């Protein structure tokens, strides 16, 4: 949406994801980055290339990142005291592809006051967790069954 609005450039989801991976960040970078983006001019219908800087992508990501930080703070506010103590000791573990956004751990740490770590296997954790659920036959009728 940002690229379309700012540059009248239509791009696909994969291109948008590539932009985020190549230059996206949650905090200012020591050395800002830029990326060349190819797409279709929505006015002329012709191919078009633009150069986009990391600072611009960071501004575009700011609202969803603020919402993420608010969700984390809300979860922390609702956390029972015993678990809150564990969180302060162990910190928050980010996982999944989004965890790899440059500086997301720093931004969440700064906004929550809780240490934040990125899983060294962030990209594999979701699929590995799903595999464990399936291997344990814990998925039944739309719900995960636990041995309570």
Model-assigned labels for residue ranges:
Residues 19, 72, 94, 130:
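Residue-level signature of catalytic and energy-coupling elements of molecular machines
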Residues 9-17, 31, 132-148:
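Acidic, glycine/GT-rich loop-and beta-edge segments that sit at the periphery of enzyme/chaperone cores
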Residues 14, 56, 63, 67, ...:
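Conserved active-site and cofactor/substrate-binding residues in soluble primary-metabolism enzymes
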